[in-house]
């Protein structure tokens, strides 16, 4: 029974649940993440409204198109701003039955290449049977006047793809999966997507980025998979290991802890989880090593492989001779000093000598200690010998800074390895090594174990390799502690530079970074400086001052562009002073108007600064890359982002790979350097306040560092040098193997 829609109603009637029907006239708003939808609906003649009269329908549904018939359950309400509307608790959309509805439906953008004119011709030809013809007799499209073969094939393909997607969307709506995620599922599994997911929902966690255990588990329990199912137990084991890798950076977990955490997650008995673990071991999805009080070390197979292969790659390079005549280091250093017009410090000379005589060496130290000088010297000396020098860094910003400071071309490690989308692997690998004689890598503290594996697989055995980095910064975002493990192993020659060169009488950025690293108080001077501390006691005041400095005070005083030159850094994503809220508020202040594409609660506008959240090899864009929105299309909810001037298109389903980046976490800023940074440090961030976090933040600023927050929080961070050790075995793997002397000869 369909309820009438009265012109006025009492409060009591507004509270009653009713059912309304109609035809979608327009989709005013639709959020692909949570399904929130605002529709303009034409009421049918059976309603007490006049025929054709429209009303506003608000509720949650998945994909919806103009012309569809809609049925909704809910209540009539009066919104203070938008007036009378129907607030639905359930919305069901079905394909239209009337000729007018079908024509509007086809012209809504549902079918690629079909607009109003062509939709009219198709419906004129087939009438009320149009949708049946498209589904079951698409060959009859030849009967439509002036419709060529190519267009017919385009319509057929688009229609059948949408049928698959519509079935998937209905499934997604039932189990609370967003349109964007369902689109990715269909893209991954094809026309059998729903059947595949029903058979094993947990494969979603493994196959698709952005879909976690909670979503897969909800689907699994809803389709009848038992709570103590081996399928569920195995998924819990994998998810627990993946969570520890991605959130804590661990490469392995103790067996007892793993089973305990998986039990806490699922309430599955430990005995069943233990059996599931053994099955995962048999199928080589996980690997076990060693024994101890806490049980075996359990690795996800890819992380175990990454550690093993990285160690193997290092041994291969250390154990292989160079193909060129050995360099006389003393003469080479003297030659370079005469050319440069100054003498190196003793520790710099030591670092340079090691890098000229050892196959693989490491140079570490904080800001201003002369690391770049050594890179420049190495490049000059090796180039003078006619050798090919390759400079690379983990991120685009780090590579650009390396090129500018050294005066030679540099690239990202991903572009050095060159992803091949056809083979779905890097072009340069163990079978096809990179071309070059000397490979120098900067900002290596950012390199995680997976990237290290790919890198060392692709380096030629004869290569000379130099890693440069700062072990006192935060470790890599991804799992592992590669630079630290290399040094810890003692298998690779490492030199630590500690004398500060890059400072003058007025510069406090470098000085304060070293103060923090030594556990000492900050220096703050009145008057002109490159380092300031602004006290803000409560989070609201801290937010207000951040916006004030970002939008007016820094641009006015220092002439810096807030969009391109100033970066806000904060320890966390959540809370008032987390990146999510900061980006929302800073966007309102810096880029408040213009056409926008919506994803979840985020608006993307032309001019917005955005960051990529994952490696997307097909787009040649990588985790942490920063770009600017160049164009938006509200019609298909796509946008174009310029990364270093290169345009990259994002479809609606890809938008979850992007976030606004007016503010970013300190960890995400690693490897980048900005003309100015605003660092928020408050007791709201208490659990994150650590020395290496503050040190990393301060070393991101080149010309200006502005600290906003509470003195107690600053002191807490400086004094808290307790760093959680990452569970890795790379150092052990390097120590346990046959030792080499670093010059290409093995020692027994």
Specify the residue positions occupied by each region the protein language model found.
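Conserved lysine of the Walker
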Residues: 371
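Walker A (P-loop) phosphate-binding loop of P-loop NTPases
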Residues: 368
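Accessory, non-ATPase domains that flank or precede helicase/AAA+ motor cores in DNA-metabolism machines
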Residues: 2-331, 748
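C-terminal accessory regions
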Residues: 625-748
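Conserved helicase motor core of P-loop NTPases
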Residues: 471-619, 630, 737-738
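N-terminal pre-P-loop "Q-motif" helix
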Residues: 341-357
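Hydrophobic anchor at the beta1->P-loop junction of P-loop NTPases
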Residues: 363, 391
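Conserved helicase motor core of SF1/SF2 NTP-dependent helicases
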Residues: 377, 381, 385-387, 393-405, ...
């Amino acid at each position: 029974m369909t309820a009438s829609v009265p012109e006025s109603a009492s409060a009591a009637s507004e509270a009653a649940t009713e059912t309304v029907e109609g035809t979608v006239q327009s989709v005013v708003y639709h959020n692909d993440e949570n399904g929130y939808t605002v529709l303009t609906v034409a009421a049918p003649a059976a309603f007490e409204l006049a025929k054709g009269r429209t009303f506003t329908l608000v509720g949650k549904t998945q994909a919806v198109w103009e012309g569809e018939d809609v049925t909704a359950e809910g209540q009539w309400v009066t919104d203070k701003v938008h007036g009378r509307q129907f607030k639905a608790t359930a919305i069901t959309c079905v394909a239209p039955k009337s000729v007018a509805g079908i024509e509007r439906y086809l012209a809504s953008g549902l079918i690629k290449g079909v607009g109003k004119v062509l939709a009219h011709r198709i419906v004129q030809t087939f009438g009320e049977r149009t949708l049946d013809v498209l589904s079951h007799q698409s060959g009859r499209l030849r009967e439509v006047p002036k419709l060529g073969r190519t267009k017919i094939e385009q319509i057929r393909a688009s229609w059948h793809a949408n049928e698959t997607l519509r079935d998937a969307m209905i499934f997604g709506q039932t189990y609370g999966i967003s349109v964007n995620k369902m689109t990715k599922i269909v893209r991954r599994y094809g026309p059998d997507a729903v059947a595949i997911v029903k058979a094993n929902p947990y494969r979603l966690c493994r196959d698709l980025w952005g879909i976690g255990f909670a979503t897969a588990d909800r689907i699994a329990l809803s389709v009848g998979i038992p709570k103590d199912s081996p399928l569920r137990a195995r998924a819990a084991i994998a998810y627990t290991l993946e969570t520890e890798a991605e959130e804590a950076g661990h490469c392995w977990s103790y067996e007892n802890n793993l089973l305990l955490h998986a039990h806490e997650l699922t309430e599955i008995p430990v005995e069943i989880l233990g059996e599931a673990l053994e099955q995962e071991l048999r199928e080589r999805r996980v690997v076990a090593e060693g024994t101890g009080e806490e049980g075996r070390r359990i690795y996800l197979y890819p992380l175990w492989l990454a550690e093993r292969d990285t160690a193997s790659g290092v041994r291969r390079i250390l154990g292989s001779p160079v193909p060129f005549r050995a360099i006389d280091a003393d003469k080479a250093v003297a030659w370079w000093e005469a050319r440069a017009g100054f003498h190196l410090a003793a520790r710099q000379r030591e670092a340079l000598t090691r890098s000229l005589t050892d196959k693989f060496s490491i140079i570490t130290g904080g800001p201003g200690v002369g690391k770049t000088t050594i890179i420049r010297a190495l490049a000059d000396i090796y180039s003078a010998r006619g050798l090919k020098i390759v400079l690379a860094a983990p991120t685009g910003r780090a590579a650009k800074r390396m090129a500018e400071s050294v005066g030679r071309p540099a690239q990202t490690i991903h572009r050095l390895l060159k992803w091949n989308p056809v083979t779905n692997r890097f072009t340069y690998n163990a079978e096809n090594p990179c071309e070059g004689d000397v490979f120098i890598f900067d900002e290596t503290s950012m390199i995680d174990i997976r990237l290290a594996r790919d890198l060392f697989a692709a380096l030629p055995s004869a290569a000379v390799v130099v890693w440069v980095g700062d072990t006192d910064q935060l470790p890599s975002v991804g799992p592992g502690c590669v630079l630290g493990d290399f040094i810890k192993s003692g298998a690779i020659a490492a030199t630590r530079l500690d004398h500060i060169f890059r400072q003058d009488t007025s510069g406090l950025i470098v000085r304060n970074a070293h103060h923090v690293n030594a556990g000492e108080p900050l220096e703050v001077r009145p008057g002109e400086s490159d380092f300031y501390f602004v006290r803000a006691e409560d989070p609201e005041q801290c937010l207000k001052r951040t916006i004030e400095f970002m939008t007016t005070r820094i641009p006015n005083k220092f002439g810096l562009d807030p969009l391109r030159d100033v970066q806000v850094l904060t320890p966390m994503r959540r809370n008032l002073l987390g990146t999510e809220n900061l980006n929302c508020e800073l966007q309102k202040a810096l880029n408040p108007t213009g056409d926008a594409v919506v994803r979840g609660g985020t608006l993307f506008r032309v001019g917005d600064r955005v960051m990529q959240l994952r490696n997307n090899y097909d787009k040649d864009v990588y985790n942490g890359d920063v770009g600017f929105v160049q164009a938006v299309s509200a019609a298909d909810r796509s946008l174009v982002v310029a990364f270093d001037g290169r345009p990259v298109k994002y479809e609606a389903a890809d938008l979850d790979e992007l976030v606004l980046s007016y503010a970013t976490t300190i960890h995400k800023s690693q490897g980048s350097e900005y003309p100015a940074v605003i660092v928020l440090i408050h007791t709201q961030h208490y659990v994150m306040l650590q020395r290496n976090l503050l040190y990393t933040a301060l070393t991101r600023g080149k010309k200006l560092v502005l600290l906003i927050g509470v003195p107690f929080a600053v002191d807490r961070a400086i004094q808290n040098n307790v760093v959680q050790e990452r569970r890795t075995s790379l150092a052990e793997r390097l120590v346990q193997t046959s030792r080499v002397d670093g010059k290409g000869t093995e020692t027994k």
